[in-house]
Design a protein with these regions (language model features):
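Short arginine-rich
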Residues: 34-36
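Short capping segments at the starts of secondary-structure elements
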Residues: 13-22, 32
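Glycine-rich, aromatic-bearing surface loops/beta-hairpins
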Residues: 101-144
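Leucine-rich, amphipathic alpha-helical/linker segments
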Residues: 81-109
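Charged low-complexity interaction tracts in eukaryotic proteins
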Residues: 2-3, 18-21, 38-92, 130-140
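Positively charged, polyanion-binding regions of nucleic-acid-associated proteins
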Residues: 1-17, 42-46, 97-108
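Alpha-helical context
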Residues: 2-3, 81, 96, 114, ...
C-alpha cells in the first residue's frame, strides 16, 4: 500500500494523536481493508522528517507541512480501533517543534547544506502558521 505523507497525516488526524504502535496498527487495518500489504514503517519516519507528523511526548500528531487527506477506507478506522479522539496541547507541541526546527536549522547552517536550508525556510512559514512560534530570526539566519 502506498500512502502519501498527507494521507498518513489524515490517518493520525482522525484520532488527534496516535502512538507509533497505534499508527502501525491503523496502517495494518487500512491495508487489510484495501486488500494490500501495509506500508513500510519507514513511511512514518519520512513523514516525521518532513514535518508532516510531529512527536508529542509519546504520540504523533499532524505537523505543520501536512494537508491531511483521509485515505480510502480511513473513516472506518476510529470504529475498528475503538480509540477516542485525543487533544494535544498546541502551545507545548509548538515549543517542542520549534526547538527541533532551530536545532535542524543550526545544523544546516553549520554544514552549509543548501538543500536543507531551503527546505527549512519553507517549513518555517508553515510552522509559524501552525503553532504559536516566531521564526523570523531563524529564517534570516538560514537565508544568510
Amino acid at each position: 500500500m502506498d500512502l502519501s505523507p498527507d494521507e498518513l497525516a489524515g490517518v493520525v488526524d482522525l484520532f488527534g494523536a496516535l502512538t507509533r504502535p497505534e499508527l502501525k496498527t491503523a496502517l495494518v487495518e487500512l491495508a487489510f481493508k484495501q486488500s494490500e500489504d501495509p506500508p513500510d514503517e519507514s513511511l512514518i519516519d519520512t513523514a516525521i522528517e518532513s514535518y508532516h507528523l510531529v512527536k508529542s511526548e509519546d504520540a504523533l500528531t499532524v505537523g505543520p507541512t501536512a494537508f491531511p487527506v483521509i485515505p480510502d477506507g480511513g473513516t472506518d478506522l476510529p470504529h475498528i480501533m475503538d480509540i477516542e479522539s485525543r487533544k494535544v496541547d498546541r502551545d507545548r507541541l509548538g515549543r517542542a517543534v520549534e526547538e527541533r526546527f532551530r536545532t535542524e536549522a543550526a545544523r544546516a547552517v553549520a554544514t552549509e547544506d543548501e538543500e536543507a536550508i531551503n527546505r527549512l525556510i519553507d517549513v518555517s512559514y508553515d510552522l509559524e502558521t501552525w503553532g504559536p512560534v516566531e521564526l523570523a530570526n531563524a529564517r534570516e539566519l538560514l537565508a544568510d
